[in-house]
Every structure is written in structure tokens, then in C-alpha cells.
Amino acid sequence: MKKLSILLLTGTLLCLSGGCDSYRNRDTRIAISYLCVGQDDMFELYDITATYSDGKGRVHTSPVTSFPWKVEYSYMPLGVHAQLEINFQPKPHIVRKESYTVGCNAYINWDCLQGGGENYSETDCYKISAEEVDAFLNDMDRKIAEGKYKLKNPSITNKSGFVQD
């Protein structure tokens, strides 16, 4: 069975409201989007779920019924590695039972806790709205679909994990 390629977009992980200092010891929100490209009949062959850890020992699992699939505004603590996996389990009627997991690490690198970074300064961090995050994700999805971005490395340790051609 051909493996599906997973593009994980960690995007720019952003504080959505409040000053950065107030989030130092609190959960904050991130937006994650990833796009799956593969067999057209994948949803007839597999039960697909996404599993991710919130960094505090809690594991969340949700079904994936279409792509691109987004986990938006999921609560995660600051400065942790978030383990994300997409699991493909063959449906019962499939004779050739083959399952696999695609996993990626998304390093939560919060500019706002480090006095600014390449995209957002500390003073800008709290000004970014949920609408802007949605616009960012939609723009990235469009660029991926147009082939303007490609996966840099399956282990995502930078801001987006994508490099522009």
C-alpha cells in the first residue's frame, strides 16, 4: 500500500491574545494545519485519526474525515514539543490489512517569550487575531496546493517547516 505523504504546517505559532508575560505559565493557543496528498479512496480504505499530546501528559485523538485537516486553537503549554501523529487503520472489510503511522514533531518556538524573532516582535505578539491566523493558514494551504512550498524535513523544528521554491 502506497504511503501517503503528510505535509505538516506548524505555521507561525502565535499568542492570540494578552501580553506574552501573562502566558508564561498558562496554556495558550496554536493553530496547526496539515495537508494529505495520496489515494483518492483513502477514506474508503482507512479509518484515519490524528493524535497529539498537549505536553502535560494528556493525549487527544480526533477523527480525520477530509483533507486538509486542521486542529485550530488547540491548547498547548509554552515551550514544549508537541507530538503529532496521523494513524491509518484499515477498515474491517479490507483484506490486505496494513496500517501505519506518520509522525512529526512540532517544536513550539514562541517568539514572544524570547524577546522577538524573525517574524513577530514581542510587542506584536498579542496583537494577532484569530482571523489573522485563519487567513495565514488559508494562504499557506493555497500556496501548498499551487506547489509553491515543499516539505523541508519531516521533523519540524522551525517556524513553518516549508521552504519556498
Please place each PLM-identified region on the residue numbering.
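Sec-dependent bacterial lipoprotein signal peptides
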Residues: 1-20
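Mature extracytoplasmic domains of secretory-pathway proteins
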Residues: 55-110
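An anionic, turn-rich surface loop/hairpin at beta-sheet edges
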Residues: 81-99, 114-136
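Calcium-regulated, polybasic anionic-phospholipid
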Residues: 36-59
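Bacterial Sec-dependent N-terminal signal peptides
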Residues: 14-39
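C-terminal partner/receptor-binding element of secreted or periplasmic proteins
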Residues: 117-165
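Extracellular and analogous surface-interaction loops
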Residues: 23-25, 70-79, 149-164
